[in-house]
Every structure is written in C-alpha cells, then in structure tokens.
Design a protein with these regions (language model features):
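PLP-dependent amino-acid enzyme catalytic core
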Residues: 1-143
C-alpha cells in the first residue's frame, strides 16, 4: 500500500481473516500493530488532535499537554510532530526509559512527577499548566495508562 504521508497511513492497516472451526462466521482481525507508531493508540491520538483542530481550539503552532504513562503519549508525540505542534508529556518517574526516549525522539518535552504523585499528580500538573497558558490539554479524562 502506498501513502503520501505517515499521517495517511494511520489506521489503514491490513485486515486478515482468522480461520475458525467453531464458527461459520467470517472473523477478521485488524493489524493495528502495523500503524506507524506500532500501536492501536495511533488512531485515537490522530482523532484527538484532529478534533481539537476542527473545533478551533488547537491553533497552528500550538502546544499540547498530556498526562500519560503509556502508548497514548507515544502516539500523541508522533502525531504532534507530524502536524508541527509542540507537546509536553507529564508522567510518573516510574515510566520506563524506553518510553521516555521514544517520546523525546518525536520531539516531546518530558516532565516527570514523583512516584508518590503518580498519575494524579501528572493530571494536576497538566491542568495547572493549561491554566497558566502553557498549552492545552487534549483529553479532559487526562489519564492514559
């Protein structure tokens, strides 16, 4: 399959038929691991950013803030990079160095909170930073694990 950009490839992963002796139904599986970021989270990350753009909340050159410790942060970092946004990821210090390095490779600024603060502290800091005008929080549920 040919795509003009990484963004265009998100979600356009192959579907394969899974054989089943127990059912006469056709069972299909979508290979979301073949997204450019290697995760099913690539699709919702793109949707979150596009929704913010389409609603007019996210302006060209804006800064995103996200409290996350998982694949959503990696996917958001990738999509933000593709679309030219800055992104600040806030997460507990217990997150693996591999996750941190992956997000940094996409250009994310990483802020670590203590393990005692955990995701609640990350969420609170994200909201405080948004209140201070340092960027916008995409998802009000905030916690992505």
């Amino acid at each position: 399959m040919y795509f003009k950009s990484i963004q265009d490839s998100i979600g356009n992963t192959a579907m394969i038929q899974i054989p089943s002796e127990a059912s006469s139904s056709i069972i299909l599986a979508k290979l979301e691991g073949n997204n450019p970021g290697g995760s099913v989270k690539d699709r919702p990350a793109l949707k979150m950013i596009e929704d913010a753009e389409n609603s007019g909340v996210l302006k060209k050159g804006g800064t995103l803030i996200e409290a996350t410790s998982g694949n959503t942060g990696i996917a958001l970092s990738m999509v933000a990079s593709i679309k030219g946004y800055k992104i600040i990821i806030i997460m507990p210090e217990t997150v693996s160095i591999e996750r941190i390095k992956t997000m940094e490779a996409y250009g994310a600024k990483i802020i670590l909170v203590s393990k005692e603060e955990d995701m609640e502290g990350a969420r609170d800091l994200a909201m405080q930073m948004q209140s201070n005008g340092e960027g916008m929080v995409l998802d009000l549920s905030l916690i992505h694990i």
